Design a protein with these regions (language model features):
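Hydrophobic packing residues within well-ordered alpha-helices of enzyme cores
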Residues: 30, 55-59, 165, 169, ...
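A general structural motif
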Residues: 5-8, 41, 65, 105, ...
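Active-site residues of response regulator receiver
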Residues: 14
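Mg2+-dependent phosphoryl-transfer enzymes with acidic/Ser/Thr/Gly-rich catalytic loops
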Residues: 2-10, 27, 188-270
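Conserved acidic, metal-coordinating active-site core of Asp-based
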Residues: 100, 104-107, 111-217, 221-229, ...
Length: 270
């Protein structure tokens, strides 16, 4: 058994591919491990690309309290709904994304507040509904609607996002958007000034913790800043090579309860 360098008082967990199995289920072992961590005085938070309503079931299942990180770091909000930090996408940039998606015949979701807006109920919208367990709302014209600033935009591609789409959009909207992917079907866009790592630092500061007292676990490239910010980091066994390369430890895959392994073997042994 190997302990972490400093006692962990804050643990940030990615959701999709980390906490949630492919069946969108959190195993009983992971639930017990999170409960044990909380009982030991560790504040556990979600650091997810999801919006609050799409993560509510997970928050309730794990009985989490306090601040959580949503929208890939664009929103930090308590479980009671108090916003601690939020940076949206500029309306003009959001409208440009919608125009681009229309020309390319791609489906786009716009996230305003805690609601998903779409122009049509396409198969991609249905995929979004099933993944998030939230019903998208239809508007006639997203370009006009997005005179208000969205927190996040997502281009949804089925069966998966084409290779090269994420870097292509990152180049096209350089300086205007941060582009990443948390699930194979999503190309996610947020304000370029935000990421999960920055949001984690904000939470640690609110809680009066040093980053050496913070641990984080994730699997995707959008988790890299999260792991880089934490004093101790864990990459899931199903994680990307770049995430594994920067992590302090590599644990089991999501199907093998990697989050529970990180807590049992390292966090609670500190």
């Amino acid at each position: 058994m190997s302990a972490v360098g400093s006692k962990v008082r804050l643990l940030a967990c990615d959701v999709d591919g980390t906490l949630l199995h492919g069946s969108l289920h959190i195993s009983e072992r992971v639930q017990r491990a999170v409960a044990d961590a909380r009982a030991a005085g560790v504040h556990v938070l979600l650091a997810t690309g999801r919006m609050p309503s799409a993560a509510r079931r997970i928050v309730e299942t794990l009985e989490l309290t306090g601040p959580q990180v949503y929208y890939n770091g664009a929103l930090v909000q308590t479980v009671e709904g108090a916003k601690l930090f939020e940076v949206p996408v500029a309306p003009g940039v959001a409208q440009s994304v919608v125009r681009y998606a229309r020309e390319a015949k791609m489906h786009v979701n716009a996230y305003v507040g805690d609601t998903i807006y779409v122009e049509r109920l396409t198969p991609e919208a249905e995929f979004t509904r099933q993944l998030n367990r939230v019903d998208p709302q239809v508007v006639d014209d997203l370009v006009s609607f997005l005179e208000r600033a969205p927190t996040k935009l997502v281009i949804v591609r089925l069966p998966t996002v084409e290779e090269g789409l994420v870097p292509s959009l990152a180049a096209r909207f350089a300086g205007e958007l941060s582009v990443s992917s948390s699930v194979p079907q999503y190309c996610e866009m947020v304000n370029p000034s935000v990421d999960k790592g920055r949001a984690l630092r904000i939470v640690a500061d609110k809680l009066g913790l040093a980053m050496s007292e913070v641990a984080a676990i994730g699997d995707g490239d959008n988790d890299r800043t999260l792991l880089e910010a934490a004093g101790t980091s864990f990459a899931m066994g199903n994680g990307s090579p770049r995430v594994k390369a920067l992590a302090t430890h590599v644990v089991g895959s999501v199907e093998d309860d990697g989050v529970a392994e990180a807590i049992e073997r390292y966090v609670l042994a500190g």
